[in-house]
């Protein structure tokens, strides 16, 4: 009976250790994914900002050609 208890405790202990290792790896993977998402957002923000500047410049040039000045006259 004592042998079965020790075996059972050993199996449960090893199961808990492997489970905690898997959880730790999962958390690391999630952190890596979060970093990738932040990088993607950073690149998207840069592209979006550049696009806004290009549109503003294009609208300014169009307004100049049409004859509108910055005051709206």
Curated annotation (Swiss-Prot):
Q: List the expressing tissues.
A: Expressed by the skin glands.
Alphabetically sorted, this entry's keywords are: Amphibian defense peptide, Antibiotic, Antimicrobial, Cleavage on pair of basic residues, Secreted, Signal
Main subcellular location: secreted
The residues the entry assigns to the signal sequence are: 1-22
Write down the InterPro entries for this protein, in alphabetical order.
Frog_antimicrobial_propeptide, FSAP
Please provide one cellular component term from the Gene Ontology annotations of this protein.
extracellular region
Propeptide residues? 23-39
Localisation per UniProt entry: Secreted
Q: Which domain of life is it from?
A: Eukaryota
Q: Which GO terms describe its biological process?
A: defense response to bacterium
**The protein's role, per its UniProt record:** Has antibacterial activity against Gram-negative bacteria E.coli ATCC 25922 (MIC=60 uM), K.pneumoniae ATCC 700603 (MIC=240 uM) and S.choleraesuis ATCC 14028 (MIC=240 uM) and against Gram-positive bacterium S.aureus ATCC 29313 (MIC=240 uM). Shows no hemolytic activity and no cytotoxicity.
Instruction: Give the record's family classification.
Output: Belongs to the frog skin active peptide (FSAP) family. Ocellatin subfamily.
Query: What is the name attached to this protein's record?
Result: Ocellatin-PT8
